[in-house]
A protein has these predicted regions:
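Internal alpha/beta loop-helix hairpins
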Residues: 1-51
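Residue-level detector of high-confidence beta-strand sites
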Residues: 4-5, 103, 159
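Short beta-alpha junctions and helix-cap segments that line functional grooves
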Residues: 7-8, 19, 84-86, 125-126
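Glycine/charge-rich catalytic "coupling/switch" loops of P-loop NTPases
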Residues: 13, 42-100, 130-159
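Short beta-strand segments
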Residues: 32, 50-53, 96, 119-123
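Short, conserved beta-turn/loop elements at beta-strand boundaries and strand-helix junctions
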Residues: 38-42, 103-110, 151
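Short, acidic/hydrophobic/Gly-rich beta-strand patch recurrent on exposed beta strands
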Residues: 44-48, 75, 111-117, 124
Length: 159
């Protein structure tokens, strides 16, 4: 069954469903169940003891589509997680904590492997990172690159 027909870049950047999101890219997109919660004017995603604030446009789309107080699938590519202190300090509402299981140096980049709610996740970071297995670190999420999928249908809600 053909899931999506598009250019390779659009398949990677704008997958239509969880299957395409997980299939395109290596390492694959991190796909994590998250609860959508409205807190005053803000909408946040809660998962694995972490809470991240959604940008206003994405928050409004979830409110309008009726996803507040439901569980969705949050998708974030490994390269859209960053352990740079500059990025973390600039976006404190979009930071998660993770305990590193595996550190894999690949020359020009490092893959950090960690778990969130028993889901294996990966961050692709700068090779100068000081993170090592056993360390609990902060990772900033590029919320402009966040994907959200319906938990039941696995179809994209927003990119």
């Amino acid at each position: 069954i053909i899931q999506q027909v598009d250019t390779p870049q659009n398949l990677y950047d704008k997958p239509c469903n969880v299957f395409v999101a997980g299939f395109m890219g290596s390492p694959q997109m991190n796909l994590i169940n998250a609860k959508v919660v409205q807190s005053g004017e803000d909408v946040v995603l809660m998962f694995g003891g972490n809470t991240v604030k959604l940008p206003e446009g994405k928050a409004q789309k979830l409110i309008e589509a009726g996803y507040v107080d439901t569980t969705v699938i949050m998708g974030i590519r490994p390269e859209d997680l960053n352990d740079s202190e500059v990025i973390i300090n600039a976006n404190p509402d979009c930071v998660i904590e993770a305990t590193i299981r595996v550190y894999e140096l690949l020359g020009a980049e490092v893959f950090l492997y960690f778990d969130i709610d028993e889901v294996n996740c990966t961050a692709r970071v700068n090779p100068r990172t000081t993170a090592r297995p056993g360390d609990t670190i902060k990772l900033g999420i590029d919320m402009t690159k966040l994907h959200i999928f319906d938990k039941d249908t696995e179809q994209v809600i927003l990119h």
